[in-house]
Structures are given as C-alpha cells and as structure tokens.
C-alpha cells in the first residue's frame, strides 16, 4: 500500500480526479488502479465543501482518509507521543500492523 502524509488539498483534489502530473500523484493513481491500500492524511483545516467532496470521492474509491487527530484521551507527554499515535494509526490502516501498541490504546482511564 501507499500512504501520503501529509496530503495537501491540491494532492487530494488531484488524486480524486485522476490527475497524475508528478511522481507522488502517479504512485497514488497506480495504487488505486491496482486495488492496493491507499491512506491519505489531509493536513488542512478548516475544510470547505469542495474539500469535503474531494475527500468523499476518494473514500468512495476505497481510499482511507485518516485525519491527524491527536488522541488527547491517552494523556500524551509530548509531541513524540502525538506523532507516534498518528504513525501507528497509518501503519494499522495500511495493514502493516495488526493492532495499536498497548500504550496507544484507550483503556477507559
């Protein structure tokens, strides 16, 4: 599979509409064409309706849209914890790992 981290709205729009004008876009296009897992982590906020429509188009095409939302309920000790959580979520979405490490799982505490 392929992960695009971060994904600008330009990249999101290009992939959503089948444009492949550079190596990154071509890799995403081939990933979709071959039915492989594509994970995109959009980096921009706020989103307007065109952004949301492009993300919906990608989702309907099988792309995993994974917003980089920090898991504050895990009580991160710093930026490394926040980054580690997002990286592990991407690896999980790609199928590289089967579960989040126990220190990154919510236990209700």
Annotate each PLM feature.
Residues 1-53, 58:
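Helix-loop-strand module that forms the ligand-binding subsite of alpha/beta enzymes
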Residues 38-51, 63-77:
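Phosphate-binding/catalytic loops
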Residues 55-59, 82-85:
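Short, hinge-like loop/turn segments at secondary-structure boundaries
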Residues 64, 69-109:
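Glycine-rich phosphate/pyrophosphate-binding loop and the adjoining helix
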């Amino acid at each position: 599979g392929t992960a695009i981290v971060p994904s600008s709205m330009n990249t999101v729009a290009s992939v959503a509409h089948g444009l492949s004008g550079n190596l990154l876009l071509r890799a995403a296009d081939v990933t979709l064409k071959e039915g492989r897992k594509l994970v995109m982590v959009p980096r921009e906020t706020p989103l307007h309706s065109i952004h949301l429509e492009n993300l919906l188009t990608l989702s309907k095409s099988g792309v995993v849209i994974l917003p980089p939302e920090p898991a504050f309920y895990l009580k991160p000790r710093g930026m490394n914890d926040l980054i580690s959580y997002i990286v592990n979520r991407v690896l999980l979405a790609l199928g590289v790992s089967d579960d989040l490490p126990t220190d990154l799982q919510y236990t209700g505490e």
